[in-house]
Amino acid sequence: MIPANASARKGPEGKYPLHYLVWHNRHRELEKEVRAGQVDIEQLDPRGRTPLHLATTLGHLECARVLLAHGADVGRENRSGWTVLQEAVSTRDLELVQLVLRYRDYQRVVKRLAGIPMLLEKLRKAQDFYVEMKWEFTSWVPLVSKICPSDTYKVWKSGQNLRVDTTLLGFDHMTWQRGNRSFVFRGQDTSAVVMEIDHDRRVVYMETLALAGQDRELLLAAAQPSEEQVLSRLTAPVVTTQLDTKNISFERNKTGILGWRSEKTEMVNGYEAKVYGASNVELITRTRTEHLSEQHKGKVKGCKTPLQSFLGIAEQHGGPQNGTLITQTLSQANPPAITAEEYFNPNFELGNRAMGRPMELTTKTQKFKAKLWLCEEHPLSLCEQVAPIIDLMAVSNALFAKLRDFITLRLPPGFPVKIEIPIFHILNARITFGNLNGCDEPVPSVRGSPGSETPSPGSDSSSVSSSSSTTSCRACEISPALFEAPRGYSVLGGQREAVPRDEDDDLLRFAIQQSLLEAGSEYDQVTIWEALTNSKPGTHPMSYEGRRQDRSAPPTPQRQPMPPAPVPSPRPSPGPGSSSHVFRSYDEQLRLAMELSAQEQEERRRRVRQEEEELERILRLSLTEQ
């Protein structure tokens, strides 16, 4: 046992007492040391790991259990950017993954509840408003843009109440999930009511979030993951995607040619906006597969679409330093035999030796340029009015999470009336704010507040005329009925499970495979060629698609999950003799599709060059005549 004056002793047991006990798997002594509370449970060792990270990487289950029970943060990342859960999955220890997943979801619920008072205060102080957020997806592959979905989020904010309407819910079972839904957040003094209104089924799922008095054991019991959730993680690659913005820079876009260039401005929904370009934005996707069996590795490779293989994304494959093939064996932790003295010595270089199982890592990096349209005279405030809403939506929506990560950067002055940011490796999202307070198009239950323009007696009293001035758009009144359960709807006491928040690679695959325009129903499986040409699905299903298990967080104690909606069965797979024919047809379809894309892109560039040359010739002639 470490003595009381351990901190005064030299060596790792004095500098890093918790890490030292974890290293030697002395969980009983670790329990006593943590209970004493004299050492920071989130202390970092010389390799950038917390005690919990080290316990997880080494596969020391009981040490991890002690640290989690005393509040160690599951969400912390190590120096390499991996979370505790991702490291747990890489150990292939089912019990450890189940334990970490349980505490991760528990801590998410606790943080969610703890953040409600601050959110309520921000909503209370902010001015009431209505705004529409239009999401459009674009791509550098011209024809891919035509199959991407679009949606308009309608946002009402009144006092401590918030409502968001949407039709694009997410992705599940290889289909875009469409539906007419409203999400209502109604703040109260000591609690908050969250409602999900399903207008298609005329059902309201209601949940009350108490701000105090939550029983820890009940929350932990509700956070217990199912065996399917754990197995789905152990049989799938560990994937993390992040926007690297440490070198990002914003510059004003220019317009004109030669010596007549000026800073570019555009009108966006009636507001004059300065156009900025953001450079040095990198989208980095890292995939780890050392925990997968050869069978599951084969499935992962088979699930890679021809289009994903075709894309010119820089790939760097990392493996052991000797370059030999890694066999999937249940090797014990710390295979390079790193000693405690070597590990805890900050001056000792470990080189390529790593803790835990030998890592198999694939890194994909692609540089993007983002664009911003900023209006300095816009009535809305990004920090006070819009940011709290994006924070709330980002909890369960991957797209809003990407948007939040971007707007938290130090942007140039002004409100971003339009933003274009990378979401996946070939897809950008363009978000446009418009119809503020119903000034462009009438909106039911929204009207100008006293002092602003009031509709005439013969007009619709529930909306503001589209001819309203900018000044009249600065304030509005919103009907309280918007934040109540609609009449005639069935109200259920527990909210059903939300649509799973899929990994980015899932979203990319689904975006390519599904046509949401006129290419059949949303449940049809389409080939790449059918998706790119927006034609009716053929008879061959996509043989490389795989189903992703539900990885959504378990419900809180108040929830009673509803049975999931029935999903149509997939079409039968083709016979053994037809598989090679299917893959050959995909390669041919892909080649033709990319040729068409390249031709369309080249034609667009040719027209731009021709226009620039014509304009330059006219300018030269005008100067000659003078």
Swiss-Prot record:
Nucleus listed as a keyword: no
Organism superkingdom: Eukaryota
Name used for this protein in its record: Ankyrin repeat domain-containing protein 13B
Its job: Ubiquitin-binding protein that specifically recognizes and binds 'Lys-63'-linked ubiquitin. Does not bind 'Lys-48'-linked ubiquitin. Positively regulates the internalization of ligand-activated EGFR by binding to the Ub moiety of ubiquitinated EGFR at the cell membrane.
Quaternary structure note: Interacts with EGFR (ubiquitinated); the interaction is direct and may regulate EGFR internalization.
InterPro entries xrefs: ANKRD13 (IPR021832), ANKRD13_C (IPR055285), Ankyrin_rpt (IPR002110), Ankyrin_rpt-contain_sf (IPR036770), UIM_dom (IPR003903)
Compartment(s) where it occurs, according to its Swiss-Prot or TrEMBL record: Cell membrane; Late endosome; Early endosome
Region forming the signal peptide: none
Organism: Mus musculus (Mouse)
The keyword Signal belongs to this UniProt entry's keyword annotation: no
Domain UIM stretches: 503-522, 585-604, 610-626
Biased composition (Pro residues): 554-575
Record-level GO cellular component terms: cytoplasm; early endosome; late endosome; perinuclear region of cytoplasm; plasma membrane
One example of a Gene Ontology biological process annotation: negative regulation of receptor internalization
Primary subcellular site in the record, as a coarse category: membrane
Gene Ontology molecular-function annotations: ubiquitin-modified protein reader activity
Keywords for this protein: Acetylation, ANK repeat, Cell membrane, Endosome, Membrane, Repeat
N-acetylmethionine: residues bearing it: 1
Segments annotated as ANK repeats: 47-76, 80-109
Ranges for region Disordered: 442-470, 534-614
Comp. bias intervals (Low complexity): 448-470
